[in-house]
Amino acid sequence: MRRTKEDAAKTRAHILDIALRLFGELGYSGASLSKIASAAKVTKGAIYWHFESKVDLYEQLIYEKSRQSFNELHGILSGPGRAADRLQQYLIRSFLLLAEDQSFRELQRVIIFKTEQLPELDAQIEQQKNSLRLLLDHLTEVIEEGKLDKSLKDNVQSADLAWEMLAFHNGVSNTWLLFPDSFPLEVKAEQIVKRFFESVVNHQN
């Protein structure tokens, strides 16, 4: 029984890996379950054993491939140290993950550039929006902490800076994904983040 469970887990992980590749190559609409099954060298029934539908496979793919990175980044924001340092490390680490973690990078490409606006994905898109709202709330809270611990300037508008951080992150990430050879993100990540925070960090503290 133990071996069967291990084999099933390996098959499920393999299907997710193949699905990530095909979604990246063909887009969500173009990567049918039949094509995924053929590329994974499993039956279509095997896919349905692990996933209820193509939508379920897509949702599980996003969850499985982003969970570790999400937990790491959340831990940085919630961890010890000055708030300004945590905010900067959050952005730096998110850029490094994008540049250095191939699976994370390919997932972002699929979500941003290869997923069409389809009715069947409305629930997933709404979930992504809710996740962004929660992130904005968390960033705003940490920025407020920064004003209290004097690592950020008193006149910083917390909600505005949270939005600006998100826009900065998405702008850099999306542009780099389109032109990865034009900018050494893994080398420049700290530099561009420090520059972004230059006007809001309290250098006197």
Cite the ranges covered by each PLM segment:
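Base-recognition residues in the alpha-helical recognition helix of bacterial helix-turn-helix
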Residues: G24, Y48-E52, Q60, E64
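Key DNA-contact positions within bacterial/archaeal DNA-binding proteins
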Residues: G45
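Hydrophobic alpha-helical connector segments
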Residues: Q60, E64, H74-F104, S158-M165, ...
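Short secondary-structure transition hinges
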Residues: L96-E141
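Hydrophobic alpha-helical bundle segments that form small-molecule/ligand-binding pockets
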Residues: D122, L132-L161, V200-N205
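Hydrophobic alpha-helical segments that form the core
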Residues: D154-T175, K188-F196
